[in-house]
Amino acid sequence: MAKLRHSRFQARKWSTLMLVLFMLFMLTIVLLMLLAFGVFSLPINNDESSPIDLSYFRRAATERSEGLGKRGDQWTEVLSWEPRAFVYHNFLSKEECEYLISLAKPHMVKSTVVDSETGKSKDSRVRTSSGTFLRRGRDKIIKTIEKRIADYTFIPADHGEGLQVLHYEAGQKYEPHYDYFVDEFNTKNGGQRMATMLMYLSDVEEGGETVFPAANMNFSSVPWYNELSECGKKGLSVKPRMGDALLFWSMRPDATLDPTSLHGGCPVIRGNKWSSTKWMHVGEYKI
């Protein structure tokens, strides 16, 4: 009887082991197929990566082929976890950047900030650019860009405000600020702002970086630190590059506000800076 029990136990043990080995084998096959088809690739080991473990990931160039014009190789760069910030390289094509600028140019006005008590726009010396809003879903190209933003962020398109196009000339800037609200008035429509997608529509010869002065990291460890302006060296900074998009979160994963998301636009020293911002809310944003 004891022998029979032992035999059954051994049979069950071998059966479980074979099942586990089979599952591991199938998982390996699936991963190899995903790699072969370019759905994802292994992290690239870059000798120039900094001690903060900047990570680089490749997207298949064919994964997001819709839109105006042809985009270059798309890849994602992890900048920081405090705040959560990522750069999507070649997020927009050159033609899409130029299209947004051409739509906005005839309607540019002096940029304002939101009054926390009334919710109305007001002039402020902390923001010296010019800008305009493009209504959400106003045409096919805008819809395509907004859908792309939704696909990358997993935030529905109807949670976003209209695209804001901004223009900074030499000397113009935006002092460090938060995109989230600290009042109840501005959260009535859509709730709190949870994330921002900042798309660069032009290159900038010098200056104009997006800077995070409260980021929890060693600012000087990034490979491009020596290329930054004095303003850019005061925090974690991203240099404007046509077609790139910077995504950062104003809220932590536990839904609390993230003070490390403090950010600003450094003064443009040489050239012009064009950008487009999409603010995304916790709930549906009605327009």
UniProtKB/Swiss-Prot annotation:
It comes from the Eukaryota. GO terms for molecular function: iron ion binding; L-ascorbic acid binding; procollagen-proline 4-dioxygenase activity. The keyword Transcription regulation does not apply. Residues 1-16 are cytoplasmic. Binds 1 Fe(2+) ion per subunit. Catalyzes the post-translational formation of 4-hydroxyproline in -Xaa-Pro-Gly- sequences in proline-rich peptide sequences of plant glycoproteins and other proteins. Hydroxyprolines are important constituent of many plant cell wall glycoproteins such as extensins, hydroxyproline-rich glycoproteins, lectins and arabinogalactan proteins. This is Probable prolyl 4-hydroxylase 3. The lineage of its organism: Eukaryota, Viridiplantae, Streptophyta, Embryophyta, Tracheophyta. The gene is P4H3.
